Curated annotation (Swiss-Prot):
It is found in: Cytoplasmic vesicle membrane; Lysosome membrane; Early endosome membrane. This is E3 ubiquitin-protein ligase MARCHF8. Its main location: membrane. The chain crosses the membrane at residues 130-150, 170-190. InterPro entries: Znf_RING, Znf_RING-CH, Znf_RING/FYVE/PHD. The lineage of its organism: Eukaryota, Metazoa, Chordata, Craniata, Vertebrata. It is a multi-pass membrane protein. One of its GO terms (biological process) is immune system process. It comes from Xenopus tropicalis.
Length: 264
């Protein structure tokens, strides 16, 4: 009896071990969700089909939509109007730096009440203020000198008409004043060119540039080329099918002849 009980206990132990091993194996083999280690970074993947600006890498919206100003494709196809305007002002170029397509632009000036000041350094501002002050003083002196000269000349002409002779000091003063006046005019012309350049800079700074989309004709041409290529491929496939059909018919004819001969 004791030996029977010992045999039963040993069998139960072996069965328990095998059951536990099978359960462990099933646990190990079952597909469970494995938690990723915390050291792996979690990145949000955005779909590649989203259109973004090639300058600021942001998407377009209702306030600032994306435009297609040139022939660039892929991720360089779209750009914001404001980003492109700022780039054109800073680079002073009118064409794409990649495909060399000249932008179709429409420029408009802002209203005078919305004009902004030029961004100049302190030294440039001091130079402009000094030159303006000097020119105002110079113009005042020239106008006063002309007035005095004309007044004295009129008196000397009256005296010369009475005497019939104009003295040399009159002609000397006239020549000196004419030379000085001519030099002043040349100097004013050079300085006025500087003022004109400043005025052009101010106008360019306060203009609004609207860049239009690339014309659809170019896109149509590209589309037409692809359409022309596709029918050629289809025609080649049709010709291949036709040749295969003719070959099959060619090989079936001898079979018909053989069948006819057998009947005879």
């Amino acid at each position: 009896m004791h030996s029977c009980w010992k045999m039963k206990l040993q069998n139960e132990k072996t069965l328990g071990h095998s059951v536990s091993r099978s359960s462990n194996i099933s646990k190990a083999g079952s597909p469970t969700s494995v938690s990723a280690p915390s050291s792996f970074p979690r990145t949000s993947v955005t779909p590649s089909s989203q259109d973004i600006c090639r300058i600021c890498h942001c998407e377009g919206d209702d306030e600032s939509p994306l435009i297609t100003p040139c022939h660039c494709t892929g991720s360089l196809h779209f750009v914001h109007q404001a980003c492109l305007q700022q780039w054109i002002k800073s680079s002073d170029t009118r064409c794409c730096e990649l495909c060399k397509f000249e932008f179709i632009m429409e420029t408009k000036l802002k209203p005078l009440r919305k004009w902004e000041k030029l961004q100049m350094t302190a030294s440039e501002r001091r130079k402009i203020m000094c030159s303006v002050t000097f020119h105002v003083i110079a113009i005042t002196c020239v106008v006063w000198s002309l007035y005095v000269l004309i007044d004295r000349t009129a008196e000397e002409i009256k005296m010369g008409q009475n005497n019939g002779i104009l003295e040399w000091p009159f002609w000397t003063k006239l020549v000196v004043v004419a030379i000085g006046f001519t030099g002043g005019l040349l100097f004013m012309y050079v300085q006025c060119k500087v003022y004109v350049q400043l005025w052009k800079r101010l106008k360019a700074y306060n203009r609004v540039i609207y860049v239009q989309n690339c014309p659809e004709t170019c896109k149509k041409k590209i589309f037409e080329k692809s359409v022309i290529i596709e029918p050629n491929l289809e025609s080649k496939e049709a010709l291949g099918i036709h040749h295969s059909d003719t070959n099959s018919s060619y090989y079936t004819e001898p079979e018909d002849c053989g069948a006819a001969i057998l009947q005879v």
